[in-house]
């Protein structure tokens, strides 16, 4: 629980640590229908072409994305193809790339990193391993009750940075079981950013049985961190890319954050205080950015 209190307390920080980035995003979606009632197949028929059982359908695209915090995206489709009958719209890869566990909710289910996570989940430490210069902690996530708004599985945490390394979660929905896998990488100066996503869903509803999969991968070309959120909270464990932002004298709130993080064990009160302080830090960084514009 000590690990998770630090991760949850710093979720707002990691959610807002990037100011801008440019990236190339590849996305591929596939669908295979094991069982498809004729009435439903008829409804999605286009020009006498209908979706068939035991045939794989695919859509994929290569995209160039420019991101500007907090939520501005400029996307250019470089290439795309689609074999799904009647489906002409391009899928926006940002719908999947933006699915961050640092948010309170993702598509209606409560994130295990939400401020209220301890009300919904039990966490257990199941060991650790070394990757490069980092210690990675394996945390089991178990919902306290059965609900379509809760997930279960594993999250992996980068120790001392208290950020996500990866996740392997499943959610039981009314339409079937959804599996969510994410992988993060140390892209710049110990800032771990998402580099791959996989959503796999076994659908069983209204007589339909199918498997639907989306995978996406990101290759970052340029990344600029939020200069108003200091990296001094963490001891640097690798050189990374890019230059260290100019250091500023820590504010009173930043000193309080540092004091909490230096504690060996955090209690729930410390976690709530850390989360609140970090929320103020993010708001202050946004105000400072607006004043410079």
Give the location of each predicted region:
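Beta-strand-dense domains in secreted/periplasmic systems and polymorphic toxin scaffolds
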Residues: 167, 195-197
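A conserved hydrophobic secondary-structure block that centers on an alpha-helix together
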Residues: 135-136, 142-154, 158, 163-170
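Structured extracytoplasmic
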Residues: 1-138, 144-150, 214-293
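Short, surface-exposed coil-to-beta transition loops
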Residues: 149-153, 177-181, 213-215
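Solvent-exposed loop/turn segments connecting transmembrane beta-strands
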Residues: 33, 147-150, 172-177, 209
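Extended lipid/amphipathic-ligand handling interfaces
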Residues: 153, 159, 179-190, 220
């Amino acid at each position: 629980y000590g690990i998770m209190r630090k991760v949850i307390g710093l979720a707002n920080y990691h959610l807002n640590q990037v100011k801008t980035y440019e990236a190339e995003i590849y996305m591929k979606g596939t669908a295979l229908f094991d069982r498809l009632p004729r009435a439903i197949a008829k409804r999605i028929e286009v020009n006498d072409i209908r979706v068939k059982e035991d045939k794989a359908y695919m859509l994929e695209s290569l995209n160039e994305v420019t991101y500007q915090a907090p939520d501005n995206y400029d996307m250019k489709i470089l290439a795309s193809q689609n074999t799904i009958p009647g489906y002409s719209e391009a899928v926006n890869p940002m719908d999947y790339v933006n699915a961050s566990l640092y948010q309170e909710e993702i598509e209606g289910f409560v994130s295990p990193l939400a401020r209220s996570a301890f009300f919904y989940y039990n966490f257990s430490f199941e060991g650790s391993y070394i990757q490069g210069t980092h210690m990675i902690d394996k945390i089991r996530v178990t919902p306290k009750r059965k609900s379509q708004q809760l997930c279960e599985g594993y999250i992996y945490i980068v120790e001392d940075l208290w950020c996500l390394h990866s996740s392997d979660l499943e959610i039981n929905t009314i339409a079937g079981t959804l599996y969510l896998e994410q992988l993060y990488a140390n892209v710049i100066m110990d800032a771990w950013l998402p580099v791959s996503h996989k959503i796999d869903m076994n659908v069983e509803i209204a007589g339909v049985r199918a498997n639907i999969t989306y995978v996406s991968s990101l290759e970052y070309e340029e990344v600029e961190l939020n200069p108003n959120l200091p990296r001094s909270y963490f001891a640097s464990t690798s050189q990374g890319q890019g230059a260290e932002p100019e250091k500023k004298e820590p504010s009173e709130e930043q000193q309080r954050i540092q004091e909490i993080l230096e504690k060996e064990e955090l209690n729930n009160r410390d976690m709530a205080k850390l989360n609140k302080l970090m929320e103020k830090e993010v708001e202050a960084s946004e105000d400072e950015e607006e004043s410079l514009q």
